[in-house]
Structure formats: structure tokens, C-alpha cells
């Protein structure tokens, strides 16, 4: 299964000078979106996954614009989870997703060739700016589970803080989610965004790929290729903009892991070169 992944698009049709680690570039969002879609099409991805924060502000027209552009390209089925910024739109987020044929993974998990694909919904926590994750679970039999979550399930707070960068925070119930997912021995691939930094982490059955933001450096578009029978996961990140002086990247452009004896093991980068070459030829 090949999944094209985008996170933290923060669409604002009327640029407001927003920033997090670096300044947002909403004026280039459409162009970069089209470039990512062209790459996903060339690679023949099976799914395009949006990891939330589609919009920056409570503006339904921003959401409609982004969903319409992604859906109109008709590259592959679309699925999404919501981010904390998307909560500002209330039910509008889910309604617009359904209108454009975009699957809400926390409402509609699905299976693909022995891979269960599911999601975590972001909900408001007991006190602002706290957020809670509601995990959808999965049904049926699977060799591997993909969990899409806007917030990382494995915290990256220490890594990001050590680099002197701002950290966007974790879910209030993050540790509970980690414990629940880690207690089940089935291998799981966690795909997340939110922190605008590219990272990877692994513990027990959990392998987490956190993708960089799309609206600011590293302007990441990502393809994750999963072979559940071989226990193989390839992550290829492509920068669609210039490298910033403050570069929030803690993982290589290409990474490879295999599920071996009940845990995820890194594999030589050389093995990825062949895979990406094969991707370009399909």
C-alpha cells in the first residue's frame, strides 16, 4: 500500500502573516499542492491522507477551497483526520469532507490488503488549549494497522525542545493512547503531524512517522509504502520549497524499517534507493 501524506496545510486565502517555526507561505500553497498531487499520481498511490490542520482560521471558504482542489485532481481516494485548528469550524469540517467524498478515518476505518487503516479524532480537552484524542479502533483481521493522528502518539517534546524550537503540545490523553496501542502486539504505523517537524520514533510495536508541515519549511510531501507481508515500511519525504535557516527536520528524506521479532528495526538507506527507483518507473 502506498499512501501520499500531507499535513498542516493551514490554508488562508487571505494571508495574515501567520507563522509557527517559520513564516507560513499561503500564497504558494496551491502550487505546492499541485506539485504534491503530481508526485502522488506518478507514484500511483493508493490513498492520499490528510493529517489535519487543513485551515488556519475559522473560515469555511478556506476549507472548501482546499478540499475542492484535492478532490478535483482525482489522483486517489482521499481520507483525513481533523487537527486542532480544524475544530474551529465545528461540524463544517465533517460536512465539507463528506461533500467532497473525503473519508473521515475516525468515523470510517477501512481495510486494504491486510492493512487496517484507522484514525484519531481531535476533541477539545477539559480546559483550553488542551485537546483529547478519540481513537476509532479497527475491526476484522489485519497483519498491520495504520493509525492516522494529527497529534503524535509518541511525544516528540524532548527532541524538539532540545533543538530550541517551539513545541505545539501533546494530547491530554497521549500516554493512554500510547499504552492502548502498544499493549496490542500487532505492528502499527502511526502517521502524525501537528508539530511542523519531521521526525521518526519507534517503541515496541509502534513505528511513528511525523511529517513536516506543508505550509512552512520543510514543505513536506511524503509517500509511505507499506508491505504487511514483508513487514516493510518505506518513508520518502520530498521538500517542495527552500530549506530554511531554522530547519525543523530530525529524520532523513528516506527511511526504511522492517518488523523483525516483534519490533521495528531500521534498515540501510541503500534499500530505499531501489524502492524509490521502482516508484518512478510504475
Q: Which residues make up each language-model segment?
A:
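Active-site environment of divalent metal-dependent phosphoester hydrolases
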Residues: 10-15, 56-60, 84-92, 108-111, ...
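Beta-strand-turn-beta hairpins that frame and shape the catalytic cleft
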Residues: 1-5, 109-119, 139-146, 202-208
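Binuclear metal-dependent phosphoesterase catalytic core
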Residues: 198-282
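A structural signal for the main folded, soluble domain(s) of proteins
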Residues: 28, 42-44, 147, 187, ...
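Divalent metal-coordination and catalytic microenvironments
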Residues: 8, 48, 53, 66, ...
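Extended active-site neighborhood of metal-dependent phosphoesterases/phosphodiesterases
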Residues: 60, 64-137, 180, 223
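His/acidic metal-ligating clusters that form di-metal
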Residues: 35-47, 125-205, 260-279
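N-terminal active-site segment of His-dependent metallophosphoesterases
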Residues: 1-64, 141, 282
Amino acid at each position: 500500500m502506498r499512501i501520499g501524506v500531507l499535513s498542516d496545510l493551514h490554508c488562508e486565502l487571505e494571508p495574515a502573516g501567520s507563522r509557527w517555526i517559520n513564516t507560513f507561505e499561503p500564497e504558494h500553497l496551491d502550487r505546492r499542492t499541485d506539485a504534491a498531487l503530481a508526485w502522488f499520481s506518478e507514484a500511483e498511490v493508493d490513498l492520499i491522507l490528510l493529517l489535519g490542520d487543513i485551515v488556519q482560521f475559522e473560515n469555511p471558504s478556506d476549507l472548501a477551497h482546499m478540499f475542492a482542489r484535492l478532490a478535483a485532481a482525482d489522483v486517489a481516494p482521499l481520507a483525513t483526520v481533523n487537527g486542532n485548528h480544524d475544530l474551529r469550524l465545528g461540524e463544517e469540517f465533517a460536512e465539507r469532507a463528506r461533500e467532497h467524498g473525503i473519508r473521515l478515518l475516525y468515523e470510517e476505518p477501512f481495510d486494504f490488503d491486510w492493512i487496517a487503516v484507522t484514525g484519531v479524532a481531535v476533541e477539545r480537552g477539559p480546559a483550553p488549549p488542551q485537546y483529547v484524542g478519540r481513537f476509532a479502533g479497527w475491526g476484522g483481521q489485519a497483519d498491520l494497522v495504520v493509525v492516522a493522528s494529527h497529534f503524535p502518539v509518541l511525544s516528540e517534546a524532548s527532541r524538539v525542545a532540545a533543538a530550541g524550537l517551539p513545541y505545539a503540545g501533546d494530547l491530554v490523553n497521549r500516554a493512554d493512547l500510547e499504552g492502548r496501542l502498544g499493549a496490542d502486539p500487532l505492528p502499527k504505523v502511526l502517521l502524525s503531524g501537528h508539530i511542523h517537524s519531521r521526525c521518526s520514533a519507534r517503541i515496541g510495536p509502534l513505528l511513528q512517522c511525523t511529517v513536516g508541515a506543508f505550509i512552512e519549511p520543510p514543505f513536506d510531501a511524503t509517500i509511505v509504502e507499506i508491505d504487511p507481508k514483508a513487514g516493510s515500511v518505506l518513508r520518502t519525504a520530498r521538500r517542495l520549497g527552500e530549506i530554511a535557516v531554522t530547519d525543523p527536520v530530525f529524520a532523513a528524506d528516506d527511511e526504511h524499517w522492517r518488523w523483525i521479532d516483534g519490533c521495528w528495526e531500521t534498515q540501510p538507506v541503500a534499500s530505499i534507493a531501489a524502492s524509490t527507483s521502482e516508484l518512478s518507473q510504475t
